[in-house]
Curated annotation (Swiss-Prot):
PANTHER family: DNA-BINDING PROTEIN HU (PTHR33175), INTEGRATION HOST FACTOR SUBUNIT ALPHA (PTHR33175:SF2). Pfam families: Bac_DNA_binding (PF00216). Belongs to the bacterial histone-like protein family. It comes from Paracoccus denitrificans (strain Pd 1222). GO terms for biological process: DNA recombination; positive regulation of metabolic process; regulation of DNA-templated transcription; regulation of translation. The keyword Nucleus does not apply. GO terms for molecular function: DNA binding; structural constituent of chromatin. This is Integration host factor subunit alpha. This protein is one of the two subunits of integration host factor, a specific DNA-binding protein that functions in genetic recombination as well as in transcriptional and translational control. Keywords: DNA recombination, DNA-binding, Transcription, Transcription regulation, Translation regulation. One of its GO terms (cellular component) is cytosol. Heterodimer of an alpha and a beta chain.
């Protein structure tokens, strides 16, 4: 497992190298795509990316939790959480450790 992290800048650089847009246009493209994904999730829509996975927002109800140190019961407020469900192809690819060709 790697300690490295893929950043927005890394994505923009990959678009620059692989697509041939300028660095500025590549960065704008990445920001635009991420913005559209974020906006859809804020509206409560699912975002399905073929062969990758599905992002969705789930509403979690209020429930009773427990403080592990004291054992005291505490209410956990209702909230919205972001969920990602990888596609079967992505699961298989990660399990096999296969990198993308190209």
């Amino acid at each position: 497992m790697s300690d490295s992290t893929l950043t927005r800048m890394d994505l923009a650089e990959a678009v620059f190298r692989e697509v041939g847009l300028s660095r500025h246009e590549s960065a704008q493209l990445v920001e635009s795509v991420l913005g559209h994904i974020s906006d859809a999730l804020v509206r409560g829509e699912q975002v399905k990316i073929s062969s990758f996975g599905t992002f969705s927002v789930r509403d979690k109800n209020e429930r009773i939790g427990r403080n592990p140190k004291t054992g005291e019961e505490v209410p956990i407020t209702p909230r919205r959480v972001l969920s990602f469900r990888p596609s079967h192809l992505m699961k298989d690819r990660v399990a096999a450790g296969n990198r993308r060709k190209g």
